[in-house]
UniProtKB/Swiss-Prot annotation:
<dbReference type="GO" id="GO:0003735">
    <property type="term" value="F:structural constituent of ribosome"/>
</dbReference>
<keyword id="KW-0689">Ribosomal protein</keyword>
<dbReference type="InterPro" id="IPR005326">
    <property type="entry name" value="Plectin_eS10_N"/>
</dbReference>
<dbReference type="GO" id="GO:0022627">
    <property type="term" value="C:cytosolic small ribosomal subunit"/>
</dbReference>
<feature type="region of interest" description="Disordered">
    <location>
        <begin position="91"/>
        <end position="156"/>
    </location>
</feature>
<dbReference type="InterPro" id="IPR037447">
    <property type="entry name" value="Ribosomal_eS10"/>
</dbReference>
<keyword id="KW-0687">Ribonucleoprotein</keyword>
<dbReference type="Pfam" id="PF03501">
    <property type="entry name" value="S10_plectin"/>
</dbReference>
<protein>
    <recommendedName>
        <fullName>Small ribosomal subunit protein eS10</fullName>
    </recommendedName>
</protein>
<comment type="similarity">
    <text>Belongs to the eukaryotic ribosomal protein eS10 family.</text>
</comment>
<keyword id="KW-0963">Cytoplasm</keyword>
<feature type="compositionally biased region" description="Basic and acidic residues">
    <location>
        <begin position="95"/>
        <end position="119"/>
    </location>
</feature>
<dbReference type="GO" id="GO:0003723">
    <property type="term" value="F:RNA binding"/>
</dbReference>
<dbReference type="InterPro" id="IPR036388">
    <property type="entry name" value="WH-like_DNA-bd_sf"/>
</dbReference>
Amino acid sequence: MLMSKKNRVMIYEYLFKEGVLVAKKDFHLPKHGEIDVPNLHVIRAMQSLVSRGYVKEQFCWRHYYWYLQNEGIQYLRDFLHLPPEIVPATLKRQTRPEAARPRPKEGAPRAQVGEDRAGYRRGFGGSDKKGEAGAGADTNFQFRGGFGRGRQEQEE
């Protein structure tokens, strides 16, 4: 598709910076959500990169998802004249602050490990479950009929 080089460079710069790109499948949308170019230009430029094997494409619920491959990183680096030190955001490690977790206070009384669960576990002095199972001590059993239509009248 014929598009200006300015639009193509804007699309490639955004893709290289983020590493991923999302576009709604709407060819008549005047502007893309993140880039200031027509949505059709974004879809066609990415379709071109997919056909060359530089980008992996997923489609779900009327949205295209494109992921930059290693060959695509090298191609865009050459196209945009970028140094090798600059990498997409998907390849950068995220730093997690260690102080984000709240630490328990040292002076707070704490239960010993397993004390709160001891009531649920079987102990040595626990009840005998197998001995308690069964019909019980009463051996005077009564067998009665069913209820409703299946029950027969007893004659006296």
